[in-house]
Amino acid sequence: MRPTRAEVNLAHLRHNLRVLERGLTGATKPQIWGVLKADAYGHGAPAVARTLERAGIPGLCVALLEEAIELRDAGIRLPILVMGGYYGPRRDGFEEIIARDLVPVVYDAGQIERLASVVRLEQRGRVGVHLKVDTGMGRLGAASSEIEAVLATLAKHPEVKLDGLMTHLACADADDLGVTIEQMRLFGEIEQRAKSFGLTPRVRHASNSAAMLRLPAALLDIVRPGVALFGISPCAGLAPDLKPVIRVRSEIVALRTIAKGDRIGYGHTWQASRESVVATVPMGYADGLSRQLSNRGAALVRGQRAPIAGAVSMDLTMLDVTDVPGARLGDEVVFLGTQDGPLGRGTISAEEIAGLTGTIAWEVLTSISRRVPRFYREP
């Protein structure tokens, strides 16, 4: 078996939950529902969900019905909100929702009609839904021009109960919070329109990680942190006590000394400027190591940075370890996270990788592929 793996520190996950809980102030603290979409941001949703459930979190959120089913099959009993709102054009998606006791998000009249017909057919009494409204994101959610028809459809189907009202904030991590404040104003207007139809949601929610850390007015009844649970602050300087949860490591499987002027890798994009020692490591872009790190990124060996030499391949990556004294076969190589070694202590963060590859830390985490096995630590 190759030595490449992702180590998930569940103690850090619990720590981050407590940090976020402590940051919620006021007479009525909102509930934290953890967002575990995309396999819990690459950390492994079942194990993360079990840890959060034991830690007392009151609910979870996912994007897809398939993600919710995976958690139910793993034995998770918490309420699970299916935020994507796509259940297929027929009724079978809603049948799964009801059978597995999930909380559906809806945003158009057709969804409500289909769900109501399933509830009547299965004689389930009432099923609670969360209505998503679009206040400025422009993706999913009932738009202002549609909201009257959607609310009227809900009002005429008593078997579908408006349990929650939600929206998604587009710019909560921006320097200027003007857009977010306007979204919250529109959300308040829609809540009042719902009440005019006799619909009063039990809970309201809008805050993602950035909003819950920056805008107390957006906290409402539930907050939905995602990336912050995994130790990534959505805004520089916010929540400095968060701890990264995942660490990606491998080992040196080959060492080679090459002459000055030799070229290596696909396209021969790296040329030795001196006699050099090159280490080969069994991790590549198929594992989530971005090809954009070719000749730009680095890894940690013996606690010291070693530059990536040449193009990142599908399964393998080469490092220039000429300046890493004592590098040898079997040495640990860390591509993401912290390493303590005989030459010092080093850290490569998801934010650093994102900066080098022109993306965001969210993508760095979710790009770690499933062929990289997750190992869970309880220090």
From Swiss-Prot:
One of its GO terms (molecular function) is pyridoxal phosphate binding. Keywords: Isomerase, Pyridoxal phosphate. PROSITE patterns: ALANINE_RACEMASE. Pathway: Amino-acid biosynthesis; D-alanine biosynthesis; D-alanine from L-alanine: step 1/1. The keyword Kinase does not apply. Substrate binds at residues 139, 314. Its EC number is 5.1.1.1. It comes from the Bacteria. GO terms for cellular component: cytosol. Belongs to the alanine racemase family. HAMAP family: Ala_racemase (MF_01201). This is Alanine racemase. It comes from Sorangium cellulosum (strain So ce56).
